[in-house]
Amino acid sequence: MIQHAGLGYRRDLAEDFLSLSENSPICFIEAAPENWLKMGGWARKQFDRVAERLPLALHGLSMSLGGQAPLDTDLIDGIKEMMRRYDCTFFSDHLSYCHDGGHLYDLLPLPFTEEMVHHTARRIREVQDRLGCRIAVENTSYYLHSPLAEMNEVEFLNAVAREADCGIHLDVNNIYVNAVNHGLLSPEAFLKNVDADRVCYIHIAGHDVETPELLIDTHGAAVLPTVWDLLELAYAKLPTIPPTLLERDFNFPPFAELEAEVAKIADYQTRAGKEYRRAA
């Protein structure tokens, strides 16, 4: 089961994961299934060895939950088989679309409308029915706000999760990035109003500061103090402490620095003084 604090698995870090000490703060790993469904060779052997040691969460990149194109049933079936193979009980994907007759290789924002709530929730239910389990949806960073919006971001997230009866995968860094870039919803208001009982998993990551008014969610830097503060606030507002993962995709520092950030997550979890939640 997925619990406590974890770190995203990346091929560049394989040897570090294989060399983890018994007292490492890393309690689980996360991987994008799209990167591994057809992967073989030495990289797959290393991944398998790490997945034997640590519980695995799957976080998708290309389900296109809000898209108009039919859902990719081959992808869903591949994820289901990967979950079976690795005894994985958790899958999440982004509340976005990324497919329009072909993969767009980006996570594009959805208009916050009632129509899109119903459309996206229906597709999430289809995914859950085919996988045979509940999934979670993640709030994404976005850089263009639709003029069609009928509600704010957290209202949209709550409405989709409620209608689909799915979990919420809360990305704390994305909350902060969107608040700065758009000025529409403060991070504090987001955390106050999110459906706390549905929050079952958390991401935290670093971002790039292009200008004081433009932040880019890159996962390529250390977590900034303002985002750590939001994580602490999230733990204070949630009824239990969800599994929380540090995302780092490139510009890798020495592995000890990543472990130190994961240890900081674990410290915040302990200080919150609440029951730990398992992602399932």
From Swiss-Prot:
Taxonomic superkingdom: Bacteria
Residues annotated as signal peptide: none
Pfam families attached to this UniProt entry: MbnB_TglH_ChrH (PF05114)
SUPFAM superfamilies reported in the protein's UniProt record: Xylose isomerase-like
PANTHER family assigned to the protein according to its UniProt record, in alphabetical order: UPF0276 PROTEIN HI_1600 (PTHR42194:SF1)
Family the entry assigns: Belongs to the UPF0276 family.
Matching NCBIfam families: PRK05409.1
Protein name: UPF0276 protein NMCC_2101
Native organism: Neisseria meningitidis serogroup C (strain 053442)
Lineage per the UniProt record: Bacteria, Pseudomonadati, Pseudomonadota, Betaproteobacteria, Neisseriales
